[in-house]
A protein has these predicted regions:
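Negatively charged
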Residues: 2-271
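A glycine-anchored, Pro-Gly-centered beta-turn/N-cap motif
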Residues: 299-303
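A short beta-strand micro-motif
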Residues: 10-11, 287, 305
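Residue-level detector of functionally pivotal "anchor" positions at catalytic/ligand-binding pockets or at interdomain
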Residues: 269-291
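Short solvent-exposed loop/turn micro-motifs enriched in small/polar/acidic residues
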Residues: 4-5, 279-280, 298
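C-terminal tail/sorting-segment detector
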Residues: 304-317
Length: 317
């Protein structure tokens, strides 16, 4: 008797609208294999209409405990357009250490109110395009531990996540990202964003990046946030009416020239913070650059100066 092959597969129960991911040797007839490359998963053609997009049928997703032994390489489009999806169970059994694409993974899951991706291993992911886009009912999302060092595309990543009141992207490594088109557009409940670690030297498109963030008051950024590679007509700050940085918001000035903390809408925060020290002694001033490196003397540009129990920023021209 031949041993059965252990494999990853997905079962769709149309009656209950439940999509179950498993990894064992008991793949039943009619089960689907995981998708590869940029292809839509096979369960869409079965659950949805002729376009291949599922809109109404999938209501629940379950990752069986057996799926903990699976090592998918691609999660793109897994749940895109699942407008009636309200719960995902067993997400802790999804090991993403070998995944390279999370493109549109949860996009347009408009009735999903909670999503725990805090255990995701994303060190090999290159594509996060539209990953959470239009998840308009999400009230919390923990992406604080995401390793984004290899990501190149963050277009639409949080687009229209209108019920998120906070979003911690302070540790995102964006040095390889080339596009952030409408990345935070329509995040109308956010009041602040910490982008102090964002290195945008390779980003060529930031169009609409913060468009419609109507309650966003503060964007923290460092010298690593630059727009030198973006086109001149890159309108970044449309309808950010509460935003205040070095200057208050002006609806007639929404372009890339306002993406700075000296004459624009950003508020300075060093990428590597230098904490203030407390002392009762008289001490000489110490100088650091914005990355926390000790200097022998002030240099041109922004300097961090520590003197006694005070830490201040000094711009040397």
């Amino acid at each position: 008797m031949l041993a059965q092959t252990v494999e990853s597969y997905v079962v769709l129960d149309n009656a209950s609208g439940t999509l179950t991911f498993k990894h064992d040797a008991n793949k039943p007839a009619g089960a689907f294999s995981l998708n590869e490359g940029e292809l839509y998963p096979a369960w869409y053609a079965m659950a949805g209409d002729d376009t291949g997009y599922n809109e109404n049928n999938i209501k629940k997703v379950v990752f069986d405990s057996s799926f903990a032994n699976a090592r998918p390489t691609n999660c793109c489009f897994w749940f895109v357009g699942c407008k009636d999806l309200i719960v995902i169970e067993g997400l802790e059994y999804l090991n993403t250490e070998k995944v390279t694409s999370m493109r549109s993974m949860f996009a347009s899951c408009i009735n999903l109110t909670s999503l725990d991706v805090s255990k995701f291993r994303t060190q090999n992911v290159t594509d996060m395009y539209y990953m959470f886009g239009d998840c308009s009912s999400l009230t919390s999302l923990d992406v604080s531990k995401f390793d984004t060092r290899n990501v190149t595309d963050m277009d639409y990543m949080f687009n229209n996540c209108s019920n998120l009141t906070s979003l911690d992207v302070s540790k995102f490594d964006t040095q390889n990202v080339t596009s952030m088109l409408t990345m935070f557009k329509g995040c109308s409940s956010l009041t602040s964003l910490d982008l102090s670690n964002f290195d945008t030297q390779n980003v060529t498109n930031m169009y609409g990046m913060f468009d419609g963030c109507v309650n966003l008051a503060t964007i923290y950024a460092s010298d690593k946030f630059v727009t030198t590679a973006c086109s001149e007509d890159c309108k970044i700050f449309g309808n950010c009416k509460k935003l205040v940085g070095a200057v208050p918001y002006d609806p007639n000035r929404v372009g890339k020239e306002m993406a700075n903390y000296t004459t624009g809408y950003f508020t300075y925060k060093a990428a590597s913070g230098i904490d203030a020290v407390s002392t009762t002694e008289n001490v000489a001033a110490e100088y650091y650059d914005v990355n926390g490196r000790r200097l022998n003397a002030p240099q041109k540009g922004l300097n961090i100066v520590k003197c006694g129990n005070r830490t201040t920023k000094v711009l040397v021209k």
